[in-house]
């Protein structure tokens, strides 16, 4: 199949390429030619079969669906375009493997994409996963926004299961420093503006506020997904029978585990979901929502209720640092920086947020 023939990412099963409300620029002509070569080489390794679909590319990972000639089920093939993307897929593969081995509820284990083959150290590197059923939550909301409340309830039910697998509460400063230090360093290293006076002041204010909040108030420590957005949640198609369980959409899969952490702050996932809803339903970027939360002292969504400012800021830090770490293109995307990153640090630099 030609790489030039591309389909919306959701048709490949939950592969989303949205970054805080702004799409990245897809690969140009040269990039598409390289993708053609990648798929040709990977196809030889996979054996007899054909490419069914190739996702529109907005990240550093080329994603395609392969149908084996022997009649077996289709698989999702992920081809990293950069070293950062290779490392992200390694993290995703390893996180899924470890989490699957620790999960006791079999229903939750079934939501994880199984690794069919991993050749991330080969040339070309590739990760092959099973295709999970379902429609991505963001696609479902675009069709039926009135389902936002039930979808959030179903999503948080999955979170309760995930977060209940292990962990406990902590105010350990060393653990908090581990959460914050690396992610703040990513912003400073990747974004030149963050190394200037205003950016540095914003980062220092962010670190001071979050460290104080997370060490003064107990924080649940457990498995965190790290990018828990509606687009990474797969749900039973509305046309399926039955499409709901007790009035809630049925979750059929949870994908994109590159930002997962075995001992992360549980609050990140719920706040990430709330911020993603703000973009999907209201068209408000993460930056706009965080500035409003900084001024109000809380993040409010009708589907999730009020969330502490520290939860929202931690989710924002997880989001922007994760994107910058997975692709250097974010640091060069002026629109993304202007709408998602700079306003938050500028607001932090201008006024220190109040503690709870």
Task: Walk through the language-model features, giving the residues of each.
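Conserved short submotifs of the Hanks-type protein kinase catalytic core
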Residues: 124-136
């Amino acid at each position: 199949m030609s790489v030039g023939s591309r389909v919306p990412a959701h048709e490949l099963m939950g592969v989303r390429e949205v970054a805080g409300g702004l799409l990245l620029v897809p690969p140009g002509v040269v990039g598409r030619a390289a993708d053609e070569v990648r798929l040709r080489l990977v196809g030889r390794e996979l054996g007899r079969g054909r490419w069914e679909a190739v996702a529109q590319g907005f990240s550093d990972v080329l994603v395609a669906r392969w149908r084996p000639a022997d009649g077996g089920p289709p698989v999702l093939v992920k081809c990293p375009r950069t070293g950062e993307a290779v490392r992200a897929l390694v993290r995703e593969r390893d996180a899924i493997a470890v989490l699957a081995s620790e999960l006791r509820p079999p229903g939750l284990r079934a939501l994880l994409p199984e690794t069919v083959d991993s050749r991330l150290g080969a040339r070309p590197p590739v990760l092959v996963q099973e295709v999970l059923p379902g429609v991505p939550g963001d696609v479902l909301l675009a069709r039926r926004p009135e389902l936002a409340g039930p979808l959030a309830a179903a999503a948080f039910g999955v979170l309760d299961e995930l977060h209940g697998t292990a962990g406990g509460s902590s105010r350990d400063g060393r653990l908090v420093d581990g959460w914050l230090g690396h992610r703040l360093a990513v912003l400073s290293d990747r974004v030149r503006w963050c190394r200037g006076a205003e950016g540095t002041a914003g980062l220092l204010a962010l670190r001071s506020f979050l460290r104080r909040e997370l060490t003064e108030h107990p924080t649940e420590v457990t498995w965190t997904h790290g990018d828990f957005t509606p687009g990474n949640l797969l749900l039973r198609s509305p046309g399926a029978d039955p499409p709901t369980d007790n009035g809630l959409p049925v979750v059929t899969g949870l994908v994109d585990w590159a930002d997962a952490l075995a001992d992360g702050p549980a609050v990140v996932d719920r706040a990430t979901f709330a911020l993603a809803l703000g973009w999907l339903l209201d068209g408000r970027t993460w930056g706009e929502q965080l500035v409003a939360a900084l001024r109000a002292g809380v993040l409010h969504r009708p589907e999730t209720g009020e969330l502490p400012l520290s939860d929202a800021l931690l989710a924002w830090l997880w989001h922007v640092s994760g994107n910058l770490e997975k692709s250097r293109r974010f640091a060069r995307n002026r629109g993304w920086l202007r709408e998602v990153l700079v306003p938050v640090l500028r607001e932090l630099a201008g006024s220190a947020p109040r503690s709870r």
